[in-house]
Amino acid sequence: MKNLCIIPARGGSKRIPRKNIINFLGKPLISYSIENALNSGIFDEVVLSSDDEEIIEVALKYGAKAPFVRDKNLSDDYASSTAVVQNAIEILQSQNQIYDHVCCLYATAPLLNKDILKQAYEKFIQNQSKFLFAATEFEYPIQRAFYLNENNQVYMFDEKHYKSRSQDLTKAYHDAGAFYFGTSKAWLEEDFIFKPHSSVFVLPRNLVCDIDTIQDLEFAKILYKVNHESAF
């Protein structure tokens, strides 16, 4: 079995400029994902998909490969991760590089480690599902969620759960925004991962942080330090 890790990292992040290579506790943010992928020992190649020369330079420095430059039409705010992975697989196949399994690993997942990737891959192989992705449990019952209308009035999405006990409600999970394993065939044929053909690898909340704002970035640093207390 040949395994490929693809790390998408475009240059045009807006809320945090240069997010993928921003300083994160002394190293570029993307370096954590590259090193975890390389040190996991499960990938034959770790490949960057980027449209940005500086990001490519940083990724090469930390051991990733960059055999192509991503097209600009796959580098805007509307390009999906699935389309980026499909593009990378097709380019590599045209170069006679064929892989059985492909993992899309986000550049913004510094809280992971090599052992998590190994365990997730083992579960992916064991389950024989089309995809396996990282998820985490919602910290509050989604059945009690509400919204505000145009007059700022409160409405529950479903009032029947107003008096339900938390322990009686079905647990709900969300995408952790970290990694997605899949067969090459599934990546090329499917356009939606969140279906019964997928399985999940549940992460504890201290290993999950969606880095979209400066506040998210600072919180991720705090979590990293807590998770690696002996190193600080």
Language-model-detected regions and their locations in the chain:
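N-terminal glycine-rich phosphate-binding loop and ensuing alpha1 helix
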Residues: K2-S49
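Conserved acidic residues
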Residues: N3, D44, K65, D100, ...
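Short active-site oxyanion
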Residues: I42-V47, K130, N206-L207
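A conserved hydrophobic position in a structured secondary element of the catalytic/binding core
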Residues: S50, A107, L112, F181-T183, ...
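Short phosphate-binding loop-to-helix
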Residues: E53-H101, L111-L112
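Conserved core of the sugar-phosphate nucleotidyltransferase
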Residues: A83, H101, P110-H197
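Short aromatic-hydrophobic micro-motifs that form the base-stacking/packing surface
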Residues: C103-L105
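Hydrophobic helical membrane-anchoring modules
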Residues: V200-V202, L207-F232
